[in-house]
Amino acid sequence: MNIQKQNNAQKEALSFIQNNVPLNNKNWFQTGGESRFYCEPRTVVEFQSALMFARTNSLPIFMLGKGANVLISDSGFPGLTIRPQLVEAMYHVTNNQHLVTAGSGMDFDDLINYCLNHQLSGLEEFSGIPSTVGGATYINLHYYEFLLSDFFVEGVIINKETGEIKTVSKEWFNFGYDQSTLQEKAWFLVSATFNLKPISAEETAYARGRAVEIKRHRYKRYPHTHTCGSFFRNFSPEEVENSSKKLIYVAYYLDKLGLKGELSFGDAIISHQHANMIVNRGNATTADILNLTLDMQKRVHEAFGIVPLPECQLIGFTENPFEK
C-alpha cells in the first residue's frame, strides 16, 4: 500500500473519533465538561484503532459505560473517552455448561432479558442496576450476597498499549468486593462469558417476576436518575476497628447526622431516600456535588473520627480532592 492509500485508510479507520464532545449528557449525574476526543467503537478493529490513536497522541483514556458511577470534572476530560458499542450476545453449550458471551458495551438489563429469553437463570438478581457488561465486570457487580464473579467464566480483553487481544480465565480478573484486575487499566474488556442455569418455562416466568420485583424494590429505596448511586464506599472492617466503630455502612453515620434530604450545595442535595446518594435537582455542576460531598466527608470525620472516601470514579481531576 502506498503512503497516500495508507493515510486514507487510517483516516477512514479513525473517522468515528469525534472532537470536543460534551459528557454531561452521557452520565447519570448529568454534569461535567467536554472530552477532548470521544468515540463509540462498534467492532474490535475500531476498538484497536481507538487505542492506537490514544497511544500515538499520548492521550489518557477514559472507558465509559452507562456513566452511573462517575463524577466528571467541569473542565471535562483531556484525553480520549471510549464508550464501547460491542452489544452482541451469544448462547452456547460447552461441556454441559450453558454459557452466554456478551460484548462489553451491552446494557446489563438487556443481557438479563437475553438470558431469560433463552430460559437461563442467575443474572436476574442484578436487575435494575445501571451498568454495561464492561462496567459490571470492572467492579464485580454485586447486589446483597450475589456477586457477578459467581457466574463469570472467562473474558476477552484488549491491551491498552499494544491492542493485543486474548482470552483469559476468571482467575486472571482476581475478583473481590468492588474489585477486579481491570481497575489497573492496562487491559480493557471486549466480552465476557457467564455460566448460567437452564430453567423451565414456568421457572422463567417466575424469574421474570423476580426481576420486576427487584427493580420495584430498588426504585422504592433509591433515586433512579441524576445520581451515581452510593457516592462513598463503605468502610473496610479494618477501618471500622481502628476507629473503634462497629458499622461499616457510611449511610449509617450520615443518617445519624440528620443529613438525608436536608444538606445541599447549589442544586446538589443528599437524597431523601438514601443518605449516601447525591441527586442533581436539575442544574447542579460537578463543583456543587464536590462541595457537598466534601462537606459530608468533613462532618462524618468530625463527628465519628472516620473518613469516608468516594466509591465513584473521579474523571478529569488533576488531583483527588478527597485525599488532601
Q: What are these model-derived regions, one by one?
A:
Residues 78-80, 98-100, 121-125, 135, ...:
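Generic beta-strand structural signal
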Residues 56-60, 216-219, 297-304:
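A common structural junction motif
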Residues 147-149:
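Short loop/turn motifs at secondary-structure junctions and domain boundaries
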Residues 2-136, 141-143:
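Anion-binding (especially nucleotide phosphate/pyrophosphate-binding) glycine-rich loop
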Residues 89-92, 153-157:
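Short polybasic amphipathic segments
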Residues 10-13, 50-54, 207-211, 292-296:
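Short amphipathic alpha-helices in soluble, non-transmembrane regions
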Residues 18-19, 25, 70, 158-160, ...:
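Phosphate/pyrophosphate- and phosphate-bearing ligand-binding catalytic cores of soluble enzymes
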